[in-house]
Amino acid sequence: MNKGGAQQKGHSSKQAENIVLVGRTGNGKSATGNSLIGKKVFASKAHASGVTMKCQTHGVVTKDGHKINVIDTPGLFDLSVSAEYISKEIVRCLTLAEGGIHAVLLVLSARTRITQEEENTLRTLQALFGSQILDYVVVVFTGGDVLEECKETLEDYLGRDCPTFIKEVMRMSSNRKVVIDNKTHDEGKKAEQVHKLLSLVDDIRRSKCGEAYTDDTYHMIKEESEKLRKHHEELESKNYSEECAAEMKNQSLILYKENLKQMSEQLEKKLKDAAEAQEKALSKMTQENNELNLALKIHIPLPPITPCNIL
């Protein structure tokens, strides 16, 4: 898979904008999706049996005319999640994103400390889609009610203890960030929050000239889906018996799923390779730091330290 490309799509009443929610479990992805939709369609962690286990999608036309397709992902980037599971759900996500990805909402929480899992989210996104995906990222901070209670702005919160990698994400995503209170019952506030968030999505559309993010995997999925559709149409146009047509459709569906599985396995390998490279880079950096500390203690010259870009 290459670093990704873009697919020309105008902002029209016919083409929905695909907005993908990513982030750690418990950060409020599903609640943010519900705020965008305007009603509860995605189950949140607060409901024990309702945590998102598979990518889900829901489309809506907002009050100000945005036609959006919100894709809620499970906690794909939690540290406990396997590369196999991530890859399968990414393929599912791309299948749901007809026309490409128009925005990725990286959901963080102002209620909790930003952890290694958030940094893992960023690394995994880049490993899967390349650094160009950051051109489509909006950083969403949930827990706006907590900041209000503390009489803090988002800038106050970030100024207190903002990890370097978050600053880097915001820099690379043109500082597109927003705070949202998913618990508010104030209809005016709800509308204002959604408007502000979708304005940032519009900023992405304008900066990319209406082009959605796509990559090799997306195009392969689209090609397989189109082949399946055409084959089913061809079967329906011929005089096969109902039983025979159903059997042939089932066989083509099995082949389609097998091809998607192969794509998933390719992504899984890509993730594992990226994780291995990251581990080696961290190990090398640790070794060089240890050598530096030792040299400072015994005052011996050292060779120059090789720069190591973690992100």
UniProtKB/Swiss-Prot annotation:
Entries under Gene3D superfamilies matching the protein:
P-loop containing nucleotide triphosphate hydrolases
**Domain AIG1-type G residues, every copy:** 14-222
Q: Which residues form a coiled coil?
A: 218-295
Tissue/organ expression:
Ubiquitous.
G1, as annotated region: 23-30
- G5, as annotated region: 181-183
Pfam families with a match to the protein in the record: AIG1
Q: What GO MF terms are annotated?
A: GTP binding
Factors inducing expression: Up-regulated by brassinolides. Down-regulated by 2-aminoethoxyvinylglycine (AVG), high CO(2), isoxaben, and propiconazole treatments.
User: What keywords were assigned to this record?
Assistant: Coiled coil, GTP-binding, Nucleotide-binding
Q: Where is this region: G3?
A: 72-75
Query: Which superkingdom is the protein from?
Result: Eukaryota
- What PANTHER family does the annotation carry? GTPASE, IMAP FAMILY MEMBER-RELATED (PTHR10903), IMMUNE-ASSOCIATED NUCLEOTIDE-BINDING PROTEIN 7 (PTHR10903:SF164)
Q: What is this protein called?
A: Immune-associated nucleotide-binding protein 7
Organism field: Arabidopsis thaliana
Supply the source organism's classification: Eukaryota, Viridiplantae, Streptophyta, Embryophyta, Tracheophyta
